[in-house]
Regions:
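Middle-to-C-terminal accessory/interaction subdomains
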Residues: 1-50, 54-167
């Protein structure tokens, strides 16, 4: 991706044969939406299936270790604006800590391939109006809080802290 033009054609066709590039877009959208402060250099994961005859042969990004979201934890990645007012569409403003290139790959795909650019914009708008909407997120987060809350007394007894501090 770094050394080839990603305009529609042979180079991009090869990338599509190896990488589910939409998962990279979704990965960036979700992490930027929740203002994850620990993802570009540390908690990045990708996988593919090992069965050559299976349907999971392309590399794809996956979410994990999401405790540094919504302004919690330490800003290890150096996100320029970790507040709720951060611009989720400012891929160019994200750093490339550790030189791992995830940001550069997405930026190059968006800038050189109209299909990727269109997908990124439309998908982000769709998510903003559905799964990222306040109504949906508040309901989801409240349900998660209700699921986790009964465990917090035992958790703080074992690991320290307080339930009040967790809330």
């Amino acid at each position: 991706i770094h050394s080839n033009n990603m305009a529609p054609g042979t180079n991009f066709d090869y990338v599509q044969s190896q990488l589910k590039w939409k998962s990279l877009c979704d990965y960036f959208m979700f992490n930027s939406y929740v203002v994850n402060q620990d993802w570009l250099n540390w908690n990045t994961a990708w996988w593919r299936g090992m069965d050559p005859a299976g349907d999971k042969t392309k590399w794809r990004y996956t979410l994990w270790d999401m405790d540094a979201t919504f302004g919690h934890y330490v800003n290890y990645t150096g996100i320029p604006d970790p507040t709720a007012n951060a611009d989720p569409c400012n891929v160019e403003g994200l750093p490339n800590p550790g030189g791992q290139g995830h940001t550069d790959i997405l930026e190059k795909l968006i800038n050189e391939n109209p299909e990727v650019e269109q997908y990124y914009v439309q998908r982000y708008v769709d998510l903003a109006n559905t799964y990222f909407s306040c109504d949906y997120m508040i309901t989801l987060l409240d349900s998660m809080l209700n699921e986790i809350s009964p465990e917090m007394t035992r958790h703080t007894a074992k690991w320290g802290g307080s339930v009040a501090g967790w809330n």
